[in-house]
Amino acid sequence: MTTTSAFMLNVRLDNVAVVAIDVPGEKVNTLKAEFAAQVRAILKQIRENKALQGVVFISAKADNFIAGADINMIGHCQNAQEAETLARQGQQLMAEIQALPVPVIAAIHGACLGGGLEMALACHRRICTDDVKTVLGLPEVQLGLLPGSGGTQRLPRLVGVSTALDMILTGKQLRARQALKAGLVDDVVPQTILLEAAVELAKKERLAQRTLPVRERILAGPLGRALLFRLVRKKTAQKTQGNYPATERIIDVIETGLAQGSSSGYDAEARAFGELAMTPQSQALRAVFFASTEVKKDPGSDAPPGPLNSVGILGGGLMGGGIAWVTACKGGLPVRIKDINTQGINHALKYSWDLLETKVRRRHIKASERDKQLALISGSTDYRGFSHRDLVIEAVFEDLPLKQQMVAEVEQNCATHTIFASNTSSLPIGDIAANAARPEQVIGLHFFSPVEKMPLVEVIPHASTSAQTIATTVKLAKKQGKTPIVVSDKAGFYVNRILAPYINEAIRMLTEGERVEHIDAALVKFGFPVGPIQLLDEVGIDTGTKIIPVLEAAYGERFSAPANVVASILNDDRKGRKNGRGFYLYGEKGRKSKKQVDPAIYKLIGVQGQSRLSAQQVAERCVMLMLNEAARCFDEKVIRSARDGDIGAVFGIGFPPFLGGPFRYMDALGPGEMVATLQRLAALYGPRYAPCEQLVRMAERREHFWTNGETDQGN
């Protein structure tokens, strides 16, 4: 229990009560069940003070309002009834705030999410700052839940049903101007005058009722509502493939509230919250949330990180440009790019310009902020400006002698403490460091494409990499907004190693006659964001298959792909989306056109293209190989823990989050079931499915990857 209250009441001389929210000992405000008594005590004082003109809720934290409710509360619930009770308690508290007899204003700066936004919705008006840190949303769906403290009922009545459905079903976060346009907030002001603006609004005796736009009023009526909900159900089912029960319950609860009234809506919301909290999907999604939070706190090693004030990048291509952007614009670090010609430097600069200009157009940042961030990036065709760089990231071609040459040049032109980080996806870091004068300062830092979107990076120390080099590189990755996992220096590292057999099997099924769209649809239905064939097209067929010979040389035949198929496709100049033709055909750039499977692909690989396997059989063949390889990586200590393996797969390749990652999924299936399934597939399709020793041992001992002490709760 906290001894200091998280909610402090101060009555100003002008008779406006200011309630400051400041959870003791925490960087971020989150709502906990034990705060209810504190809030009620303050509400009692407010009701008893007849001289009060209004109330303002504001955060005392530097950059957040309330980031949500403490998710650990849900994990403590033993059954659906306890979770439902938790929701009803939240609903009651919000109702008491809404029922205050004077104007109540939420003054919002920073993150206002989940339970924080539900509290703001219970206030009579909302004002927020124009700061980039200010975002408002209800992200509970991302944890397999719905808003449980009245959010499903208040939001549709405030912003309209279609806007509310979009926000709650996606968990999207609105920036200040978007929130103002939607009617979620009443005003947007600079942070310096937030409190005074809120106080002035609180002093107004009568707050005008906001009128919904005509479109929203039509959709709220019986006919418009019926049409809207029918369309939303259909679209949501297509998107979720039935894997996320929370989305269907969200639609039901919002519809109930609009059709039968708020009281029925609140009842439905609390019941749905309780039931969803007990679903395996919500438990898995919460586990992913806690695991990712832990990974972000993990320093990578016990050593303190070295200096990290500026970064160099070798290569201005697609990866180099993306790395420059996340380093400068996310991390706030000065970046110097070296390329063999000015064209490469200009490409990297344009990469950042385009991303920042899009933000300016969408009014996410001001032009002055764009210029400030761009000023952090500079370039050169030689090593001028590199002498003081603390870390240099190499993003040149996958050529070992070239990368070794880069190491030598950096050691010659940079400081003695400078770290050399290679963005290789396939070459051993130990080989890259083989001729280094300071091998302890050489490390792998594997980004995924597109760099600005993919959240994961693999940090790969080789045998001689120092603990400080690891810590410094992990620190950089976090500054870049990435989630880093430390993996061993073995062929394919972790993510590409478990991805390769999955894609290989999809190609193998193509050679057996299965249709491209059938294979992709089967894996999307299983829960992946895109199918394996489409993924190969997106990555680039030439790029995606380059690692297969490396893995086959290291691990043997289980990594062999139908070589003639890959060769035939590449020889036909099919690289995927980047050149407009792969397994799919793509329209002209800039034109919206649906991708279509190229029927010529079947003739090219010598098959008819007639599917014989069920979607479940297709998914099983691909996924079981991925799981088996993940278990091998665990056994060989390629990954440090099941936690890192789950996060790597979910964030790196889109492994279905509602399954919790490959290791939680294998635990759910049970090692005995895993071994039996792999043995059955091995009998049908060959020894590549033979269960690895790790799984066989675990089946014999009835062990799990996640130990009993590791729950779906945070520490």
UniProtKB/Swiss-Prot annotation:
UniProt subcellular location: Cytoplasm
GO biological process: fatty acid beta-oxidation
Alphabetized NCBIfam families for the sequence: FadJ (TIGR02440), PRK11154.1 (NF008363)
Primary site of residence: cytoplasm
Entry-linked InterPro entries: 3-OHacyl-CoA_DH_CS, 3-OHacyl-CoA_DH_NAD-bd, 3HC_DH_C, 6-PGluconate_DH-like_C_sf, ClpP/crotonase-like_dom_sf, Enoyl-CoA_hydra/iso, FA_oxidation_alpha_subunit, FadJ
EC number(s) on file: 4.2.1.17, 5.1.2.3, 1.1.1.35
Similarity remark: In the N-terminal section; belongs to the enoyl-CoA hydratase/isomerase family. In the central section; belongs to the 3-hydroxyacyl-CoA dehydrogenase family.
Gene3D superfamilies membership: 1.10.1040.50, 2-enoyl-CoA Hydratase, Chain A, domain 1, NAD(P)-binding Rossmann-like Domain
Pfam families: 3HCDH, 3HCDH_N, ECH_1
Chain intervals for the UniProt region annotation (3-hydroxyacyl-CoA dehydrogenase): 306-715
Entry GO CC: cytoplasm
Pathway of action: Lipid metabolism; fatty acid beta-oxidation
Gene Ontology molecular function: any one: enoyl-CoA hydratase activity
Protein known as: Fatty acid oxidation complex subunit alpha
Enoyl-CoA hydratase, as annotated region: 1-190
Keyword terms: Cytoplasm, Fatty acid metabolism, Isomerase, Lipid degradation, Lipid metabolism, Lyase, Multifunctional enzyme, NAD, Oxidoreductase
Record has Lyase as a keyword: yes
Species of origin: Salmonella newport (strain SL254)
Complex formation: Heterotetramer of two alpha chains (FadJ) and two beta chains (FadI).
